[in-house]
């Protein structure tokens, strides 16, 4: 399967999705979103894929929405575009496979919002982050006003959203937006090292851990702990649980399906 604006590579249980529109700094237009939606469906359906990595081609991760395409849109057209992007981003956030952002450059607007949808976030030291929508007279359209406060707290999020200021990778790391910052030449090596570590673990257990964490972030702990209990119990008797326990008793590395 091939796409115009997305490159897809699968190797050793890791799918790498690369935004491939460098002439526009990988800006998100309707065609990119359509390609992204299709490629995400592909990796979700592929049982051989255990981890999904997102990165960008060239000097940009995603430079935001395509302002040229949006210029002249009516309110209804803007709503349709926002709903499409929001739906794809939510699909990525909820997919049962762990996702890693490898931010190689600019992550502005929708690019920053995309990063917030992923599970683990790496960036090179030259990466920049910005939500500039208020400088354009608009509001973030891919749920940045919702995810950023949950990530770093309301007060810090409001400062970033109200000012439209630029964040360095070091800033984003300090705020808790990023997990790791690397030198540019080391970015993908470090991303793949972690992806490989995750891929070696039980895919079924990881999918349930992710579901439990996602569910618990929006509910009382007394409800969330029952969800966790149900997921934990569901693991027992599965091939991965049997293999995991056997490997522990036999003092060897587990070989999960």
Regions found by a protein language model. Give the residues of each.
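C-terminal long alpha-helix characteristic of the crotonase
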Residues: 22, 122-127, 178-226, 230-239, ...
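Well-ordered beta-strand positions
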Residues: 120, 159, 163-165, 171, ...
């Amino acid at each position: 399967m091939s796409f115009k604006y997305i490159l897809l590579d699968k190797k050793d249980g890791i799918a790498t999705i690369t935004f491939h529109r460098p002439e526009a700094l990988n800006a998100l237009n309707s065609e990119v979103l359509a390609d992204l939606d299709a490629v995400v469906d592909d990796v979700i359906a592929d049982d051989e894929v255990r981890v999904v990595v997102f990165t960008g081609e060239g000097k940009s991760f995603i430079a935001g929405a395509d302002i040229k395409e949006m210029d002249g849109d009516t309110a209804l057209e803007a709503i349709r575009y926002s709903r499409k992007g929001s739906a794809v981003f939510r699909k990525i956030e909820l997919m049962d496979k762990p996702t890693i952002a490898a931010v190689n450059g600019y992550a502005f607007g929708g690019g920053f919002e995309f990063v917030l949808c992923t599970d683990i976030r790496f960036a090179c030291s030259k990466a920049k982050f910005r939500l500039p929508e208020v400088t354009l007279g608009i509001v973030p359209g891919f749920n940045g006003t919702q995810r950023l406060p949950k990530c770093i707290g309301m007060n810090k999020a409001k400062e970033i959203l109200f000012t439209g200021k630029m964040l360095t990778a070091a800033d984003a790391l300090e705020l808790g937006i990023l997990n790791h910052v690397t030198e540019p030449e080391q970015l993908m090596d470090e991303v793949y090292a972690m992806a490989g570590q995750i891929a070696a673990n039980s895919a079924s257990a990881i999918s349930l851990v992710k579901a439990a964490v996602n569910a618990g972030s929006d509910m009382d702990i007394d409800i969330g702990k029952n969800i966790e209990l149900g997921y934990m119990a569901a693991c027992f008797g599965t091939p991965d649980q049997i293999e995991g326990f056997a490997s522990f008793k036999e003092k060897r590395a587990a070989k999960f399906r």
